[in-house]
Structures are given as C-alpha cells and as structure tokens.
Amino acid sequence: MARIAGVDIPNDKRVVISLTYVYGIGLATSKKILAAAGISEDVRVRDLTSDQEDAIRREVDAIKVEGDLRREVNLNIKRLMEIGSYRGIRHRRGLPVRGQNTKNNARTRKGKAVAIAGKKK
C-alpha cells in the first residue's frame, strides 16, 4: 500500500480511484493531480514507480487535504456560530443549515424522535 498524505491507498485499484481515499480528493481532483503529474489514470497503484509516487505526493502536498481541510471546515463553522449568522444558529441548534423543511423530516440532524406523553389517542 502506498502512503499519500498520511493515508494508505489500496494497491489493487487504479490510481485515479485510490487517490479518492484521501479526504478532500474526489474524482475530479484526482484526475487533475494525475494530469499534472503526467501519469495515466489506468495505472494500478502497485505498478507505480517511486518517481511517479513522489510526483503524486508533490501534487497532493500543494492541495489542502486531510487534517488541514478538516480543521479549516471546523473553524469556518465555529466562525459562523460566533458571529451569530443564520447558518451559525442552525449549526448551534443542530438543525439543517441549507433551507430544508423540518416539520416532518430532518431526522439525521435532529436525532431520534422523542415521544410526547399524552399525545396518542
């Protein structure tokens, strides 16, 4: 297994798919990285030379991934909560942030439904 940005990527998959195991790298970014490094998307990770692995590492190091990206996202959410914006208030209350209705659904954000005593008749 090759190690890129602190993540073990699978050996038996194509490089373009294996790179998506790194947080912050999707399929589009993976393709851009390989194009910049001059590596074919069809190559398997186990077939990469050490020079090719180093080229991929250099390209990935130029992008904000893994811990740095997670930290930035968390700081952005914290900043929204501190300034008291609508989105920050929704984050603080654990409700959907992007305008979804909450009358019936939104169970993922709100948690398990709590039964109200005396409601059933």
Swiss-Prot record:
Keywords from the UniProt entry: Ribonucleoprotein, Ribosomal protein, RNA-binding, rRNA-binding, tRNA-binding
Basic residues bias: start-end ranges: 106-121
PROSITE patterns to which the protein is assigned, alphabetical: RIBOSOMAL_S13_1, RIBOSOMAL_S13_2
A Pfam family it matches: Ribosomal_S13
Family of this protein: Belongs to the universal ribosomal protein uS13 family.
Function: Located at the top of the head of the 30S subunit, it contacts several helices of the 16S rRNA. In the 70S ribosome it contacts the 23S rRNA (bridge B1a) and protein L5 of the 50S subunit (bridge B1b), connecting the 2 subunits; these bridges are implicated in subunit movement. Contacts the tRNAs in the A and P-sites.
Name this polypeptide is given: Small ribosomal subunit protein uS13
Species this chain originates from: Streptococcus pneumoniae serotype 4 (strain ATCC BAA-334 / TIGR4)
Gene that this sequence comes from: rpsM
